[in-house]
UniProtKB/Swiss-Prot annotation:
It comes from Homo sapiens (Human). Residues 74-191 form the PX domain. Belongs to the sorting nexin family. May play a role in cellular vesicle trafficking. Has been proposed to function as a sorting protein that targets SELPLG into endosomes, but has no effect on SELPLG internalization from the cell surface, or on SELPLG-mediated cell-cell adhesion. This is Sorting nexin-20. GO terms for molecular function: phosphatidylinositol phosphate binding; phosphatidylinositol-3-phosphate binding; phosphatidylinositol-4,5-bisphosphate binding. It is found in: Early endosome membrane; Cell membrane; Cytoplasm; Nucleus. Coiled coil: none annotated. It is a peripheral membrane protein. A 1,2-diacyl-sn-glycero-3-phospho-(1D-myo-inositol-3-phosphate) binds at R116, S118, K143, R157. The PX domain binds phosphatidylinositol 3-phosphate which is necessary for localization to the endosomes. The modification Phosphoserine is found at S3.
Amino acid sequence: MASPEHPGSPGCMGPITQCTARTQQEAPATGPDLPHPGPDGHLDTHSGLSSNSSMTTRELQQYWQNQKCRWKHVKLLFEIASARIEERKVSKFVVYQIIVIQTGSFDNNKAVLERRYSDFAKLQKALLKTFREEIEDVEFPRKHLTGNFAEEMICERRRALQEYLGLLYAIRCVRRSREFLDFLTRPELREAFGCLRAGQYPRALELLLRVLPLQEKLTAHCPAAAVPALCAVLLCHRDLDRPAEAFAAGERALQRLQAREGHRYYAPLLDAMVRLAYALGKDFVTLQERLEESQLRRPTPRGITLKELTVREYLH
């Protein structure tokens, strides 16, 4: 079984590897090395095929084809398109709009997010704790004593922050780090899972569908990282009486788990898919057999439901 889980910590597979080379000295990827995006640093230790996998020959071929494809590096471009000043009762700050697109092909799922200067500063502080040597040549745009809200200064800092993100992304260990992923996705995911817990399914779904494409691009080397969010999409659709859309989201999640029967989401997801398949008149027997085989090999004291598991994510 997977090692003990920490609530609020969606797991990702593989060891944490430290980067010892700069961008121009990057070595090819040899295994998943993304720390999972939760706050507690837990890693799912079950990567790769289960030794007791019951996959058919065709499924095995598809699995290894996916393994080859997963190492194709997805290249992203960061653009800070605009900035605006926002004033509140006791504070005044600049909000930057970040657009993230995939290069090399038409990207109809570009991500648009907003971050404050203080968010960038927190990212820099977090990265210095783990990657001080790796980012020593990356200049972070500092605040000035005066003039921070002048139009010329905002434009200058906008360009500098855009360059900053590009330089960070060029460093392999940084772009795969929990800190970088959290900066780009965690605020939206935390709000989405909060809405899920509150039963606000339309709003949760809106946020999830906005952030999921970016999360999947950032974790292309670690497909299971997006499983919690995909399961949240399944739950939203299911509770909004959209079983077909829920089933489609579940299929995407299962594809990312492949034969990883030890993953904490594997059995709860299969159980939910069996019920959806039955309701939709689809083949639920095959899914039921996979679930039963998994439970025989990895018996658990009490089956946790997919919803019980998913609502524990992003609590903090």
